[in-house]
Every structure is written in C-alpha cells, then in structure tokens.
Regions:
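Mixed-charge (Asp/Glu-Lys/Arg
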Residues: 1-34, 40-144
Length: 144
C-alpha cells in the first residue's frame, strides 16, 4: 500500500469511527466499483458518503483546510479527473485536526471545498465556510 492509499484508508476509518461514536451503523461496499466509501444508516434514511483526506491550504496555514471534491483515474498514458454527481454520493466527509466534517455534494460543487476556522481579516462572509458549522455531529442533526 502506498502512502496515498494509506492516508485515504486512515481518513476513511476515522470517518467510520466518527459516525459509529455517534451511534450510527456504517456499511462499506465489497468492491471498488462504488463511488462512495461508506453508507451511513441514520435510522430514518441512508446517506452515501465519499471520504476525502484534507490538508491545510497553502496560503492560510492553520486557518483553513480543504478537500478535493473530484476523483482521478490513472493508467499508463494519462491521469483523468472525474467530478462526483448527486446520483453517486450525497456527502463528502473528512477527518481533520481530530474532528470530522461533513458537507453535501450540492454545497461542495466545485473542485476544492475549503473550511476556515474563522472569517478572514477582510471580514468577507460570502463564500466562506466556517468549520464549526460542518462538524459531523451538527450536520447529521439537520439530516435526521
């Protein structure tokens, strides 16, 4: 297993543990053909979740972190990026800095989704996603 696969698996396991600690069951596909990593049984409904490894953003180190909201396939000739659709997944989940974060695919429609711990010094609010609003335990309350 290469380091990228190891990081992805670690993120996925943290996401599963996060939902499990909240009292929800998680289901995983038996093969790699599914676009989602886990299905979470929220009791009243199931959600398809794609787990993504987050990292600090280069220009705002320790103030913002982000995930790539696409997937890529690689063969001997090229790497191709693919966008997820609402027919494939419902949410993106990540585990970052000891906390799980969940965002719907509708909201994370770009190539990168960025969370910030606070508003920028310019006090810009439009298009800014404050991390506390996306904690898994808070988002799930709005789903069930």
């Amino acid at each position: 297993m290469d380091i990228t696969q190891q990081k992805g698996l670690t993120t996925e396991l943290h996401c599963i543990l996060d939902f499990t600690n909240l009292g929800y069951s998680c289901l995983t596909p038996i093969d790699d053909s599914s676009k989602y990593d886990i299905v979470v049984d929220l009791g009243s409904k199931f959600i398809r979740v794609q787990c993504k490894t987050a990292s600090w953003t280069d220009d705002t180190k320790e103030k913002a972190f982000a995930i790539h909201t696409n997937r890529q396939t690689t063969n001997t000739q090229k790497t191709t990026r693919h966008k997820y659709t609402e027919d494939e997944i419902d949410y993106f989940d990540t585990w970052f800095n000891e906390q799980g974060y969940l965002v719907s695919i509708r909201e994370a429609s770009g190539v990168i989704f960025t969370w910030r711990y606070e508003y920028p010094s310019s006090n810009q609010k439009q298009g800014i996603h404050i991390a506390n609003n996306y904690k898994v335990e808070e988002v799930v309350k709005g789903i069930v």
